[in-house]
């Protein structure tokens, strides 16, 4: 991929139920082996804004590449968790149009655009 000018992102599925120390180890290893960015996936939508902020804040202490977040909306908190992740140190996020995604959906792109404006 990198030989063709592409970037590599390691997305850790179900990361929200994984210990932060283990995630740091996995991410640092991936970066040492060429990953340009990493992504914490709240695959089952269990984070709260507080826990989202804290996880990204702790990751940012040891990770020097862009960190993205990927949230699911199982408890209706995907957008709130995304904003909390950005405040905690994420530099980008995954989203879908109208929040359409598996189960209860994902972070809604348009809600993030409007929320960011105000």
Residue ranges and their predicted role:
Residues 1-66, 83-90:
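Alpha/beta enzyme core
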Residues 44-47, 54-118:
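Catalytic alpha/beta core domains of metabolic enzymes, predominantly
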């Amino acid at each position: 991929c990198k030989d063709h000018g592409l970037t590599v992102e390691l997305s850790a599925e179900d990361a929200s139920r994984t210990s932060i120390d283990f995630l740091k180890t996995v991410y640092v290893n991936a970066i040492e082996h060429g990953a340009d960015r990493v992504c914490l996936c709240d695959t089952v939508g269990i984070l709260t804004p507080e826990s989202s902020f804290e996880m990204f804040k702790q990751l940012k202490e040891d990770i020097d590449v862009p960190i993205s977040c990927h949230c699911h909306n199982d408890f209706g908190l995907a957008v709130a968790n995304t904003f909390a992740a950005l405040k905690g140190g994420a530099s980008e996020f995954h989203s879908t149009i109208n929040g359409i995604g598996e189960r209860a959906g994902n972070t809604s792109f348009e809600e993030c655009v409007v929320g960011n404006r105000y």
